[in-house]
Amino acid sequence: MKIVVQRVKQASVTNESIHEEIGKGLCLLVGVGQDSTEKDVEAVAKKIVNARIFEDENGKLNLNVQQVGGAILSISQFTLYADVKKGNRPGFTNSKPPEEANRLYEAFNEALCQYGVEVKTGEFGTDMLVDIANDGPVTIIYESQDGKII
């Protein structure tokens, strides 16, 4: 799995059927690759929820999303696995097929919820308008393979 984590002051996702938004927290762009498994879901969810990327009273990155009362906006993003080696049009054969990817994306969101953080989501497999107000900016890419962070 590949997940782009952005610390935000606010973020929202909208399409014809949904509108979800959060205030302070994390916006996650979640990519599910061909080799992604349930072990990756658990490993990366734990790592992200516990990531100390919010400032404490001394300005040091020392607090996680729960400690600041933040929420998570999780958005599926198959384009994170784009192959751009040949030509000018990206290929997406490195992304897991939609049905399997959606299953792991949903499992990932459930894993985040198990840590007691509020999680809102986009709608899998649809075009969406994503509005992100980065805070910092703090942007970190997490990758997991075979249940280990790489």
From Swiss-Prot:
One of its GO terms (molecular function) is tRNA binding. Belongs to the DTD family. It catalyses: glycyl-tRNA(Ala) + H2O = tRNA(Ala) + glycine + H(+); a D-aminoacyl-tRNA + H2O = a tRNA + a D-alpha-amino acid + H(+). An aminoacyl-tRNA editing enzyme that deacylates mischarged D-aminoacyl-tRNAs. Also deacylates mischarged glycyl-tRNA(Ala), protecting cells against glycine mischarging by AlaRS. Acts via tRNA-based rather than protein-based catalysis; rejects L-amino acids rather than detecting D-amino acids in the active site. By recycling D-aminoacyl-tRNA to D-amino acids and free tRNA molecules, this enzyme counteracts the toxicity associated with the formation of D-aminoacyl-tRNA entities in vivo and helps enforce protein L-homochirality. GO terms for cellular component: cytoplasm. A Gly-cisPro motif from one monomer fits into the active site of the other monomer to allow specific chiral rejection of L-amino acids. It is found in: Cytoplasm. NCBIfam families: D-aminoacyl-tRNA deacylase. This is D-aminoacyl-tRNA deacylase. PANTHER family: D-AMINOACYL-TRNA DEACYLASE 1 (PTHR10472:SF5), D-TYROSYL-TRNA TYR DEACYLASE (PTHR10472). It comes from Staphylococcus carnosus (strain TM300). Keywords: Cytoplasm, Hydrolase, RNA-binding, tRNA-binding. The gene is dtd. Pfam families: Tyr_Deacylase. The keyword Protein biosynthesis does not apply. Homodimer. InterPro entries: Daa-tRNA_deacyls_DTD, DTD-like_sf. Coiled coil: none annotated. One of its GO terms (biological process) is D-amino acid catabolic process. Its EC number is 3.1.1.96. A motif (Gly-cisPro motif, important for rejection of L-amino acids) lies at residues 136-137.
